Curated annotation (Swiss-Prot):
This is Argininosuccinate lyase. InterPro entries: Arg_succ_lyase_C, Argininosuccinate_lyase, Fumarase/histidase_N, Fumarate_lyase_CS, Fumarate_lyase_fam, Fumarate_lyase_N, L-Aspartase-like. Its EC number is 4.3.2.1. Belongs to the lyase 1 family. Argininosuccinate lyase subfamily. Gene3D superfamilies: Fumarase/aspartase (C-terminal domain), Fumarase/aspartase (Central domain), Fumarase/aspartase (N-terminal domain). It is found in: Cytoplasm. The gene is argH. The keyword Amino-acid biosynthesis applies. Transmembrane segments: none annotated.
Length: 464
């Protein structure tokens, strides 16, 4: 006869119930219930394996699976009663299963601990989340390629130190973000590979005495392999840390892109227009059209960076194997995944709708002596050392600042006062088109190279 005074699955050795506040403080069901699909998936695979090795009968297996599928339906219908006193998603589902099918429900946990159960659930969940995020990256990249192709010959100023540097095409600029997102995609694919190793079968920490078939369970759940050490399987969360690191890099890229969009929509730049559906107004200033989506993405990057630091701090002092600290792994991981996915979705919707203001971009590229490097290169081709050419053009730029003339606005006579190597053909070099077309190599800003890069990008997306 049971003498459990706690009503908990682990209450046999306890003589009094858990304090009500402590029960609430230690419960995780309010946030880990989002793992229910993966918890049920893992339990169905575990029950199937237990029947295969003879620990459960086929009838017991079928009863458990039918019960779990019914519970999944209750959860998705919103009729499931989540109980804080049952601590977590695992015990809530197991208790409901026992309510429905009786003592057979108590056999499900044979050869399993919540330690390897939750580690498995999180990996299954993260695997699915990464797949969703990869889809949003691809969708955003497709939008960038479409915009880049349309704007392959749209000229704008390129910047260093936020100062006018050299002319570039808007398409080339957009493709820089495509390249960064490609690396983000690769990092997440690599992260998924390491997350897709099954800890189930590690039990509490040392494995189990039952004749389990871990490879069979892994096959049922779509894992690439089983973990090779039970202590490692239940205790580490490096796969979650790795995801948050990859997510942080991706959010850093989106944050930088957001900063550019905020600048470009400002009255001081006016390079692009964002459709109204991605903006909001002011409660006091009637004229305002605020780029809230990029501003929020820029701000939300801090949440993901915080999740990374939180998980690193969470893990750094833990001895092997499982510790209750690890309950704190889920909220930062969930938030990081949600934030990255939503930010990518917002960008994937917004980028194709950007409307560049071609005339303003071009006018900005005509200011700031953006073709100064082209003049230096022109003189190099005339046989002068580059450092001498750099100094010559620097004097010409100073003259331009003093007279209010860009290099292309100076007469041949004015230019020749700095070098007698300058001839009439220099003016073709000093045009914006001459500047961008001259950079006609792989990775360059020339329109022909932008179009070629778009083709390569589309091929990459098609291969995924």
């Amino acid at each position: 006869m049971s003498t459990d005074k706690t009503n908990q699955s682990w209450g046999g050795r306890f003589s009094e119930p858990v304090d009500a506040f402590v029960a609430r403080f230690t419960a995780s069901v309010t946030f880990d219930q989002r793992l229910y699909r993966h918890d049920i998936m893992g339990s169905i695979a575990h029950a199937t394996m237990l029947a295969k090795v003879g620990v459960l009968t086929d009838a017991e297996r079928d009863s458990i699976i039918d019960g779990l599928n019914t519970i999944r339906g209750e959860i998705e219908a919103g009729t499931f009663d989540w109980r804080v006193d049952l601590e977590d998603v695992h015990m809530n589902i197991e208790a409901r299963l026992t309510d429905r099918i009786g003592v057979t429900g108590k056999k499900l946990h044979t050869g399993r601990s919540r330690n390897d159960q939750v580690a498995t659930d999180i990996r299954l969940w993260l695997r699915d989340e990464i797949d969703l995020i990869l889809g949003e990256i691809t969708r955003l990249q497709k939008g960038l390629l479409e915009q880049a192709e349309r704007e392959s010959d749209t000229i704008m100023p390129g910047f260093t130190h936020l100062q006018t540097a050299q002319p570039v095409t808007f398409g080339h600029h957009l493709l820089a973000w495509f390249e960064m997102l490609s690396r983000d995609y690769e990092r997440l694919v690599d992260c998924r590979k390491r997350a897709n190793r099954m800890p189930l079968g590690s039990a509490a920490l040392a494995g189990t005495t039952y004749p389990i078939d871990r490879e069979y369970t892994a096959q049922l759940l779509g894992f690439d392999a089983v973990g090779g050490n039970s202590l490692d399987g239940v205790s580490d969360r490096d796969f979650a840390i790795e995801f948050c690191a990859a997510a942080s890099i991706a959010m850093m890229h989106l944050s930088r892109f957001s900063e550019e969009l905020v600048l470009w929509t400002s009255a001081q730049f006016q390079f692009i227009d964002l459709p109204d559906r991605f903006c909001t107004g002011s409660s006091i200033m009637p004229q305002k059209k605020n780029p809230d989506v990029p501003e929020l993405v820029r701000g939300k990057s801090g949440r993901v960076f915080g999740a990374l630091m939180g998980l690193l701090t969470l893990m750094k002092g833990q001895p092997l194997a499982y510790n209750k600290d690890n309950q704190e792994d889920k909220e930062p991981l969930f938030d990081a995944a949600d934030t990255l996915r939503d930010s990518l979705r917002a960008f994937a919707d917004m980028i194709p709708a950007i409307k560049p203001k071609h005339a303003i971009m071009r006018e900005a590229a005509l200011r700031g002596f953006s073709t100064a490097t082209d003049l230096a290169d022109y003189l190099v081709r005339r046989g002068l050392p580059f450092r001498d050419c750099h100094e010559i053009v620097g004097h010409a730029v100073k003259y331009g600042v003093d007279t209010g003339k860009d290099l292309a606005e100076m007469s041949l006579e004015e230019l020749r006062q700095f070098s007698d190597q300058i001839e009439q053909d220099v003016f073709a070099v000093l045009t914006l088109e001459g500047s961008v077309n001259a950079r006609n190599h792989v990775g360059g800003t020339a329109p022909a190279q932008v179009k070629a890069a778009v083709v390569r990008g589309l091929t990459l997306l098609a291969s995924r």
